[in-house]
Design a protein with these regions (language model features):
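Bacterial N-terminal signal peptides that target proteins for export
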Residues: 2-12
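C-terminal motif of bacterial Sec signal peptides marking the signal peptidase cleavage site
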Residues: 21-24
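Conserved functional acidic sites
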Residues: 28-248
Length: 248
């Protein structure tokens, strides 16, 4: 539930980083001198470990060690259950100490995926996504690790999963590993009211997650400032939804 962008401005480094983050937007393109067609600017965020803090306390994406979020929902494949646990583990990525979040999914009671995601927050309050180690299962056996990636390895680059000061219309890269992981996010609204099994939440942030390489990814996510995390995921088209049922 990667719950899976445009906000830095206090120094020259941060201003440059902002341009990198926005490289997926129309303002981040340039003309190809030979063809005359727009050419997407290179995405290359500059990461300085000194710009990061130890605590992740963004109001929409708060990762306190020990917290556990449980989600359930109906998908085209059946009933899904997801457990997201903020561990007390850390991983060093590009010199940054990232918090390890374990995301485990079951379909019709059978384990289908076990993932460790790596997140870190910068001084401005942006939450960065530095990669994941994922395993897909069939009949309790690992059948694939496709989708695993680590920022700084094989030209993979981190992205922002939650900006410090989200604004409607912001568009940002959540991850970048060319041809493997290229999820994007758009800020749709800041004032949504959402009702799920766990309760009713107001002033939720709504995002649209999509991918340039994975056309099946097209979903809305709703983040509650009261919970500090995702409370609902649902397909942009269709009836599939996965919602928060418990917080421990």
């Amino acid at each position: 539930m990667k719950a899976k962008n445009a906000v830095k401005a206090s120094t020259v480094l941060i201003a440059f980083l902002l341009l990198s983050i926005l490289s997926g937007c129309s303002g981040g393109t340039k003309k190809n001198s030979e063809s005359g067609k727009p050419k997407e600017a290179e995405y290359n965020p500059k990461i300085d470990p000194k710009d990061f803090v130890s605590k992740i306390d963004n109001k929409y994406f708060t990762l306190a060690p020990g917290r556990k979020f449980i989600y359930e929902g109906k998908t085209s494949a059946g009933t899904e259950r997801i457990e997201v646990i903020v561990t007390d583990e850390s991983k060093r990525v590009m010199g940054v100490t990232a918090t390890v979040v374990r995301d485990t999914a079951w379909l019709e009671g059978e384990l289908i995926e076990d993932t460790k995601d790596w997140f870190a927050q910068d001084k401005e309050g942006n939450v960065w996504y530095f990669g994941e180690e994922t395993k897909e299962y069939e009949k309790n056996k690992v059948v694939s690790t496709k989708g695993s990636w680590e920022a700084g390895v094989d030209d993979a680059k981190p992205g922002i999963v939650m900006p410090a000061s989200p604004k409607v219309g912001d568009s940002y890269r959540q991850e970048y590993f060319k041809g493997e992981a290229e999820d994007m996010g758009d800020i749709v609204a800041l004032d949504r009211k959402v009702t799920v099994k766990y309760g009713t939440f107001e002033n939720c942030l709504q995002t649209r997650d999509w991918s340039k390489i994975e056309k099946s990814l097209n979903e809305y996510k709703y983040y509650s400032p009261d919970i500090g995390f995702v409370v609902l995921e649902k397909a942009v088209k269709g009836k599939e939804r996965v919602e928060l049922v418990s917080v421990e």
